[in-house]
A protein has these predicted regions:
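Glycine/proline-centered hinge or cleavage motifs at structural transition points of membrane proteins
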Residues: 189-190, 203, 437, 441
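Transmembrane alpha-helices
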Residues: 12, 17-24, 108, 161, ...
Length: 667
């Protein structure tokens, strides 16, 4: 009976570990795939690792991650060790209370810590601005900067803050094992408190310090949520970069970088566990030795550490930190521009080309939706220079005074923008924007899975596709296609019509029509044949069709849809306005527009690029561009005539959208 129970327990344990590590093992295996598929093995290759180390954005995030982790670990280890010693000197009741307080940040949700730190920095920056203005007004010898933004410094402070509790937790037990009489004896023999600390206390607690430091370094390497809220626009950690890369599809390059991150954390944890096991074995051996045996052996001769080894180790560590500082920040000491856009919404070679031509360093970050961008800006966590929101969000930002008027004399390529994309409703006087891309929202469907052609939004509510339909995770688009199905305008301000559309979504959700809400996760779902129907953007459909053998099709439904324009804007009081306008002018050029159209499959508003793209494609690939593909990329006027552009809705209607969307998530 006991043997059967033991076997059963082992099987359960094996299955648990298999379930836990099988996905990671699969990720590691496909990081060596010669092709770009995550399901079909095409041969062994280290190609993706080579690509990884040649990617400027990834390597910059690696440097930032390692640097912030090293600095945060060093500072937190020093501060946490002295804090632990301070706890140790207190009375037991007080010490227990403080230890409980110390444990709270480790048990607290990272999202709470991240948002709290973000709000703290925003409040401090507002206070600093008022203080600097007052201080500068009463004297002229020292001028304090009035504008502070989230940057590498705030990221470092955040990492130090969440690392210190781990140091205290690791050092505390070693201090409690320490015989207090040793410290008293050392001080009776003439040691100062500091000498007693370094000669007596430090050697005893060193194992705890090392374990705490390794844990802190691991936590910093692995952190995403707190970094996301405190890094600002100029610093991006490796975890943030991976998150941005996964917004489209999981490529073998992402597998490669995830593998390296997993191996790094695994090695650090192994070092921690091996060291702790070694220290426990030493402690047990010491306990086995009797006092008589120790006395019989006589005084143990300890090998004095070579001072040159200490100096060399310190110098090596200093060189590593300095090298990383120079690597990460050497380029940003000059002119920079901080850009925020959507995932895979630019040909990254254009970033390199712009930097080469202008000497301006580009810090490029991504966000998943207009609403996420707005929330980030309102929270004060997005100190960008250039953003690329959609039309309706631009209108909202203008109304709230969050955008800066452009100096179009610095943007001569604005003259290349087709007249159809000037003086639109979101910027009727062309003061704030330069159009970046345009396109339509429609239905993407798998022809084999649906067994025919789709022409209407009613397919999004059809029971025959239950469990195979992806609902776009965007309140305007999701409620928008429901409104169109009912024959209403996308921009209706009638609450009853909006609620009627909402009830359609709720009913379909309860009937199991929707597989789930998605944004860029749609790429993996549709390309892998894991869903039949989805609502998404025409340019992304073309990207999917180009990367899969699944028979995907796209349609702008007969009821009409949304046609959108994403435009480049400069945020109010942007610190690098001249650089921002230089970036906008470069991206609006015909050369950049053609390269970008070919990479992201979205049409450019540049009239020369629109006219030249079919011949550009044929010259580049040696075959003509399919007219049907071009009609999806740059839809003809008859398609646009049955579509609407979003406009910014009144505040009470936006609040209604938000409330209904939250209710839909609950339902």
């Amino acid at each position: 009976m006991k043997k059967t129970s033991l076997t059963f327990n082992r099987v359960i344990m094996a299955l648990a570990f298999l379930f836990l590590y099988a996905p990671i093992f699969l990720l590691i295996v496909f990081s060596f795939n010669a092709g770009d598929s995550n399901t079909v093995w095409e041969g062994f290759s280290t190609h993706w690792y080579a690509e990884l180390f040649q990617d400027r954005l990834i390597m910059q995030s690696v440097y930032t991650t390692v640097l912030v982790s090293l600095l945060a670990t060093i500072i937190a280890t020093i501060g946490g060790t002295f804090a632990a010693v301070g706890f140790y000197s207190l009375r037991r009741r007080t010490r227990n209370v403080l230890n409980t307080v110390n444990n709270i940040p480790m048990m607290n949700a990272d999202i709470v810590t991240g948002v709290a730190m973000c709000l703290f920095f925003v409040a401090f920056f507002a206070f600093w601005k008022d203080l600097a203005i007052w201080f500068n007004s009463i004297q002229s010898f020292i001028e304090l900067p009035t504008r502070l933004t989230m940057n590498f410094g705030t990221l470092l402070i955040a990492h130090i803050t969440f690392n210190i509790p781990y140091i205290i937790l690791s050092v505390g037990p070693k201090l409690r094992q320490l015989d207090k009489n040793l410290v008293d004896a050392a001080m009776d023999l003439g040691c100062t408190w500091m000498q007693a600390f370094f000669k007596v206390i430090l050697p005893e607690i060193k194992p705890g310090i090392v374990s705490g430091a390794l844990t802190a370094f691991t936590m910093s390497i692995d952190d995403f949520i707190i970094s996301y809220f405190t890094s600002g626009s100029s610093s991006s950690t490796l975890a943030m970069t991976i998150y941005g890369m996964t917004k489209k599809r999981v490529t073998p390059e992402i597998n490669a970088i995830s593998t390296l991150l997993f191996v790094t954390v695994l090695v650090l944890l192994a070092v921690i566990n091996i060291r702790e096991a070694h220290m426990e074995q030493q402690a047990q051996r010491r306990k086995l030795l009797s006092t008589a045996e120790i006395a019989a052996r006589g005084p143990e001769k300890r090998r004095k550490p070579n001072p040159f080894m200490k100096i060399g180790a310190g110098a090596l560590a200093a060189v590593m930190v300095i090298t990383l500082v120079v690597s990460v920040h050497g380029k940003t000491t000059g002119r920079v521009v901080n850009v925020c856009s959507w995932g895979e919404y630019i040909d990254e070679s254009l970033i390199t080309e712009f930097e080469k031509r202008t000497g301006i360093t580009v810090n490029y970050q991504t966000v998943e939706s207009n609403e996420a961008l707005y929330a980030l800006l309102k929270a004060g966590a997005g100190d960008y220079d250039v953003i690329v929101p959609s039309d309706y969000m631009i209108s909202r930002l203008i109304e709230e005074g969050m955008l800066e008027e452009l100096d179009y004399s610095n943007i001569p390529n604005f003259e290349l923008i087709d007249e159809r994309f000037k003086n639109l409703s979101y910027d009727p006087e062309n003061k704030y924007t330069v159009p970046y891309t345009w396109g339509t929202v429609g239905i993407i469907y798998n022809e084999d899975m649906v067994g025919g052609e789709i022409t209407s939004w009613s397919a999004m509510f059809d029971d025959q596709y239950a469990g195979e339909v992806l609902l776009i995770n965007n309140s305007r688009d999701a409620l928008g296609f429901a409104l169109k199905t009912l024959g209403y305008s996308l921009n209706t301000t009638d609450p009853d019509q909006i609620r009627e559309a909402f009830e359609m979504l709720v009913d379909a959700t309860r009937r199991g029509v929707y597989q789930g809400k998605v944004m860029d996760e749609i790429f993996g779902k549709m390309e892998g044949g894991n869903a039949a129907i989805a609502t998404y953007y025409a340019g992304d459909y073309l990207s999917m069709a180009d990367n899969t053998d699944e028979p995907l099709a796209f349609v702008v439904p007969e009821e009409g849809s949304n046609w959108f324009v994403d435009a480049m804007c400069v945020l109010k009081d942007a610190p690098h306005k001249d650089e921002a306008e230089a970036w906008i002018n470069f991206m609006a050029s015909t050369e950049a527009s053609l390269a970008n159209m070919d990479y992201i499959w979205y049409a450019s508003p540049n009239r020369e690029a629109l006219d030249r793209y079919p011949s550009y494609y044929e010259e580049l690939y040696g075959e003509p561009l399919d007219p049907d593909v071009y009609a999806i990329m740059a839809p003809p006027q008859e398609v646009l005539d049955r579509c609407e552009s979003y406009v910014n809705l009144p505040a009470e209607i936006l609040a209604l959208y938000n409330d209904l969307w939250i209710q839909l998530g609950v339902s």
